[in-house]
Amino acid sequence: MIVISRHVAIPDGELEITAIRAQGAGGQHVNKTSTAIHLRFDIRASSLPEYYKERLLAASHHLISSDGVIVIKAQEYRSQELNREAALARLVAMIKELTTEKKARRPTRPTRASKERRLASKAQKSSVKAMRGKVRSGRE
């Protein structure tokens, strides 16, 4: 049972976890052992609440396929168990991220100090550019 929140959990039977051979450096070990984890989670066939399903299916996330299946591949570690834990943690984090309401930004105005800093910076740049001109003597 994978716990998402206090009221929401995913039964282990809804997850399709397979061990596959990892890619990359590691020599003979990586070529002979199946330490990478390929996790598939079908959103539509899951027991998640409808609100969660709608939010996940509406999201345009690169890990969600067009037919509503979340596919996660974990191969960071040399251990199959650590990769399994990493894949499950990524699944939980993704579901939490996509189903939480984003707080609306409250519009603010620039502070007086920030306006003064901006104007001082503009004045300094202006004087630097003014000094780049030709030097004129006062006797003309």
Curated annotation (Swiss-Prot):
The keyword Hydrolase applies. Pfam families: RF-1. Keywords: Cytoplasm, Hydrolase, Translation regulation. Its EC number is 3.1.1.29. One of its GO terms (biological process) is regulation of translation. Residues 100-140 are annotated as: Disordered. Transmembrane segments: none annotated. Residues 131-140 have a biased composition (Basic residues). GO terms for molecular function: peptidyl-tRNA hydrolase activity; ribosome binding; translation release factor activity. Its main location: cytoplasm. PROSITE patterns: RF_PROK_I. It catalyses: an N-acyl-L-alpha-aminoacyl-tRNA + H2O = an N-acyl-L-amino acid + a tRNA + H(+). It is found in: Cytoplasm. GO terms for cellular component: cytoplasm. InterPro entries: Pep_chain_release_fac_I (IPR000352), Pep_chain_release_fac_I_sf (IPR045853). Signal peptide: none annotated. Rescues stalled ribosomes. Can hydrolyze peptidyl-tRNA on ribosomes stalled by both non-stop mRNAs and mRNAs that contain rare codon clusters or ribosomes stalled in the middle of mRNA. First identified as a complementary ribosome rescue system when the stalled ribosome cannot be rescued by the SsrA(tmRNA)-SmpB quality control system or the alternative ribosome-rescue factor A (arfA). Belongs to the prokaryotic/mitochondrial release factor family. The unstructured C-terminal region is required for ribosome binding and peptidyl-tRNA hydrolase activity. The C-terminal tail functions as a sensor to discriminate between stalled and actively translating ribosomes by binding in the mRNA entry channel downstream of the A site between the head and shoulder of the 30S subunit. This allows the N-terminal globular domain to sample different conformations, so that its conserved GGQ motif is optimally positioned in the peptidyltransferase center (PTC) to catalyze the hydrolysis of peptidyl-tRNA. Associated with 70S ribosomes and polysomes. This is Peptidyl-tRNA hydrolase ArfB. The gene is arfB.
